[in-house]
A protein has these predicted regions:
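Charge-biased low-complexity segments
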Residues: 2-5, 23-147
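Bacterial N-terminal signal peptides
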Residues: 10-19
Length: 147
């Protein structure tokens, strides 16, 4: 009986923590990438992503959008593939890039407030600026503050 009560209590505590975490995540400001510098400045000059040797559509012009949170310490958290266009195996490369990003707080972020944002990167993009922009535009995500 005691074990059962402890397990039930542990399960209830876990559920409460998950609900509290989800509620906290919903309160994080969502900022579009083009507005991010008011909140956080990227400090990386380069990254060294993990790139697969084989996979689907690795040689096609592709855009990848990865959502993530920038924590109060300037580190990225919870990178998640949001979109890969066309579908293929380059999404993990985008996650690998985001995991390496680091930030310092911007002028509008005196308390180092965490924000939710996303990163778009392209692979095998054409030289023509209009064609390149058309591919990258496919990975813009709705629901992020743009003003």
């Amino acid at each position: 009986m005691i074990r059962l009560k402890l397990r039930t209590g542990a399960i209830a505590a876990t559920v409460l923590l998950l609900v509290a975490g989800a509620a906290e995540a919903q309160n994080v400001r969502r900022v579009a990438p083009e507005r991010l510098t008011g909140y956080w400045f990227l400090t990386n000059k380069s990254v060294n992503p993990d790139v697969p040797n084989t996979g689907k559509n690795l040689d096609q012009p592709t855009c990848v959008a990865v959502t993530y949170m920038i924590g109060s310490d300037g580190r990225t958290q919870n990178p998640t593939i949001a979109k890969v266009e066309p579908a293929g195996d380059l999404g993990q490369v985008g996650v690998s890039i985001v995991k390496q990003l680091s930030y310092v707080k911007g002028s509008q972020n005196g308390t180092a407030e965490p924000v939710q944002t996303y990163y778009v990167t392209g692979f095998n993009l054409p030289e023509d600026p209009a064609k390149k922009a058309a591919i990258l535009d496919k990975c813009k995500l709705p629901g992020y503050q743009t003003t």
